Amino acid sequence: MTEQKLTELLRDMSLEEKVNQMSQVTGGFFNGEIVVTGPMADKGFTEDNVNLAGSVIGSMGAETLKSIQKNYMEKHPHHIPLLFMLDVINGYKTVFPIPLAQGASFEPELSEQCASVAAKEASVSGLHVTFAPMTDLVRDARWGRVMESTGEDPYLNSLFCTAMVRGFQGNSLKDNYAIAACVKHFAGYGAPTAGRDYNTVELSEHTFREFYLPSYQAGIDAGAALVMTSFNTVNGIPATGNKKLMRDILREQMKFDGVLISDWAAIEEIIYHGYCADREEAAARAVDAGVDIDMMTGIYSENLCQMVRDGKIREELIDEACLRILRLKNKLGLFENPYKDADQKKEQEYILCEEHRKLAREAAKKSFVLLKNEEHILPLEQQKKIAFIGPYVDNRNLFGAWSFIADAKDVMTLHEAVQEQYVSENSTFCQGSPMLGADVCLEGFGEQQQQSYTKEQEEHMLQEAVQAAKEADIVVLAIGEDRLQSGEATSNANIRIPEVQEALLDRIAEVNQNIVVVLFSGRPLDIREINKKAKAILQVWLPGTEGARAIADTLFGKYNPSGKLPMSFPYCVGQVPVHYNEYSTGRPHVEGKDKDRFRSKYLDIPNEPLYPFGYGLSYTTFEVSDIHLDRTWMDTSGQIEAEVTVKNTGNCTGTETLQLYIHDIAASVVRPVRELKDFKKVTLRPGEEKKVVFTITEQQLLFLTENGIYESEAGEFEIFIGKDSSTDNKASFVLKK
């Protein structure tokens, strides 16, 4: 449909029809099958405005959605199709590693492939829009939704956001198997005070623009069709009613011209923030800020028409919002084919097909981070007597909290994966402990997880595990967070594994010191005790449908881990939020070298995290040479090539990710101690070496000045090239102007 036809359609629509295009309801209003992702309350919907609603959240399945679409369009005066939306975060039925784990791959193109597969499965099930990617910058591991981000670095986040948008949307939204991406949560949702979900966000203008906005901008530049508002206040004003944030910054400065949708009930919640007195005022604030779709409150549908008639808001605001929604439907080709890709036969053909599972296995392997490997205890030797112990040994729930479409029956356990590929009569398998303590109950999206073991059963599990550990050469301890301990509304002040699992670790360590920990989590954890007791730690996150096979491949050396941390693992929760790209202080502290008390440091713990951003080991070892610069100065139109030689000094083929960091030594605005500017992956055979060249241009030296624009300044810069953000391999050059 042409723009002229869309404008004519808009002109023919009644005010009620336009307003209700701006309302979103669940499929439960149509067929009783519903998945909820927010607090349920009296939403104020009537049968009339539901029958005119513009979009549906929380329903899926080709047959179901085609039926809803058909019945809806028959009743609609202008036969305008519905949009079907769902949180397809890291996969549909084929689940990939959580986004934080995908960030550990340092391979955005792999995430693009994963998003493309997720879009294919979702689209044949009738969906048009996913509420992904979440590109919020995260620094606080107490916040449960760090699992949905790709980490603490704005450059890395931007690359992954771009890749995921491209993967979901393809070359055109009208293409087969393309769905519209929604960048979220705008803005600053990843910086809640005290790491408590939905909490206040206080960010300086400089920090907000330089660290938090770039990844949103990357998604917009990649063509994301939607942006979602965040629940939180930003410097005292709720984002969903923040006209400066949504109109001045998002639409005017960042050039976003797509659909802006609220998060679940977020328009209503600006009343609870104390920003509005009632639902009518909330509707006025949100529509004035440019929020096009009200997700699940009924505030728009029950208030806007009368407010227009009373002259309290301009109808032009309704028209511009409705037109953006119609444009999105048109871009998806729904006016020509309202069912788009929905197809039951293709659901059976594509969902969980072998090709998709193969990609899920590859993505899982590349997300694993080897944190520790003393005495080269990994990879495992099959002839050894190995005891696999822990609540994750026979657990099929290897996907993140948002994977409510996935089915655990489609997932292989670690026990099954080991027996399938590396069967050995010397291996034993036992649970050892419950996942959680007996008094812990977790509620997820329509599901609960509560332990039902008696004290006697727990003691029996523990004794069985201790005996198995005594008789084993090596213990593989599969432990970590439950999948429902991370995600939305899962803030934790204690970011350690559950106490019952810590007790299991303690008892096993008493009888066998050859412990390999396979660590599952949706966030960085405080793993000091694990680090003391384990000889090896393999961080596997929440790895998805093919996670168990990927873990088995890695443990037994079929795959050599190469992942790098996208988020620092704190020494303890007292450091949080901790991140590598902090500003220097006037009294900087050098760990292990500076004994002066009057420095910026803790008295009881180190300043540095236990494992820093960019860190990750391999089964082999790599040696990185000193940095060679082809010149020691450049002007704004020039470039410098920084070269290192990396050599595989170990006994097996492996992949290293070399990382380039830059530090502006003296600037008009204090710069971070280092910032990631580029990275390159290199795969080498034993003894092989390769020259790796990074090109430095003025673009990498730009920063946000006091003038509010990005500029470079003449002066000296340090560059660091190494295997993680703590590398001391450096050189320097001068920018002349």
Question: Locations of the language-model features?
Answer:
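Glycoside hydrolase catalytic-domain context in secreted enzymes
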Residues: 1-705, 711-725, 736-737
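Edge beta-strands of extracellular beta-sandwich domains
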Residues: 729-733
